[in-house]
Amino acid sequence: MKKIFFYVVIMISIILFCLGFINKESRNEYTNDLEGTLSYGIDEIPKHLGKVTNLSKRHEDIVCAVSKGLVSKSEDNKIVPSLASEIIKDSEGIQYEFKLRDDIFWSDGSKITPKDIVDFFKELIKEEDEENIQALLGVYGTKEFKAGKIKFETGVAIKGTENSVIIRLNSKNDNFLSELTKPQYRLRKYLVMWANITKNYNALIYSGDYKINYVGKDNMTLKRNEKSSNNVISNINILNDDSVEMSMAAYEVKQRDIVINPPKSELNKLAEQQKLITMPEMKATYLVINNKENSIPIQGRREIYNDICKAIESYQNLNNKEFEVAEGSFFREDKQDLTKLQARKVSSNKEGEWAKPQILTLLCEDNNENRILSRSIQEWFKDNTNITIKYSLVKEELKDEELKKRYDMLLLNNEANISDKQNFYSKFKEYLTDNQNKLLEKPIIYDYSSLEESLFDNYNILPLVFYNENIAISNKISQFKLDGNGNIDFSTLK
């Protein structure tokens, strides 16, 4: 009997021991804990969240977490109502009526009204830098109000009704709603106080899914706005990490749940562990080949572009998470147009003679993306051609017109926003030929195909890569999305 009892005790002990391992294993699996806390690092805790001029994309994320706009942009670039429940546009495309939802509240429990939004737009027009509020400056009377020439209430076509905000533009603007989705247009009360968020965060009320609960030198905490209509995670802890390597080290010991753009050396491992989310972003890089008194003929520019594309493809084959090669498309979405791509491929393969130089010089802004591209191009040319690439990485010097003229090529970063081609091509204005500038400066232009073909035929401005946003996630997270502007959509975190 004693022997049987002994064996029973041994068996129970073994079972309990194994159950302990099972429980331990289950704790390593994803758990959707809405009452928990998510932590991630950024390179600096912001002291202000007023003007967006000097805010990084990660600082903009905070504005998006604690405030909402009339509309937002989904990850697939669709305009969706946010504070608005419905958007009515008149037949001329000039007047917009935003009907507000019934269930929108400030974090103190008071209802968000049309007057709140009108008052915010009034303050935003006064306080924000002009380049950041182009959508509102296209509204009737706003430029005169900003210049102090008229009163807002009587001269600006932004009006509130009982449950709507009505805005009338000077002229049709197909990008108006898209612009309104940007962080600067998100509803913030007492905007001037946001200029010193460290001091004033506790005195503010918030329109978003979160409110700022604490701001210090080393971290900021966001707490769920109990008045929000979205079911979101309870707390977000944003910590000051001097580098992404520091964030990654903390992630490895489970002190960070999110690492945005982790070191490229970690990407393959994270992907294998199914802890990496890769999403397309608008950031892209383009090659400008200077036409210094026709020093490089068309055939030369064609071959240089082809070789640089080969260099980048060689790097991308080993690092396929960082970016997508452009393959002759100025916008990522255009890569679906196989007819256009095939025509450009045929054009780029034309053969001819030209006097190849021993050295080609390359200038670009000093950032991580350009360092990788420049080094890859240099190494590939060294191994595969008789041309030496000498590149320079600069900061403020990139504004020096004379300096840029002394280089054969430039790498330029731009936002490849297919819905705002006017702004996209305007950023290349100084590098366009006279004929190309005439195409760009037409009073009304919706079809940019002639300009694009001219750029490609002349080989003066050419697409290279479209970047991806890579995010490492912990076991706490099963879903993570960026909105159409590249900001974290905290409402989708699960």
Model-predicted regions and their roles:
Residues 224-269:
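Ligand-site clamp/hinge motif
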Residues 300, 306, 319-356, 368-371:
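Structural transition elements
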Residues 134-191:
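Surface-exposed binding/hinge segments that line
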Residues 169-235:
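Gly/Pro-rich hinge or "lid" segments in bacterial periplasmic/extracellular proteins
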Residues 41-91, 122, 205:
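N-terminal lobe/hinge region of extracytoplasmic solute-binding protein
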Residues 42-63, 83, 110, 176-186, ...:
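A structural "hinge/loop" feature
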Residues 86-135, 296:
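Aromatic- and charge-enriched surface segment that lines or borders ligand/interaction sites
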Residues 315, 387-398, 412, 421-478, ...:
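Extracytoplasmic/peripheral linker and loop segments enriched in polar/acidic and small residues
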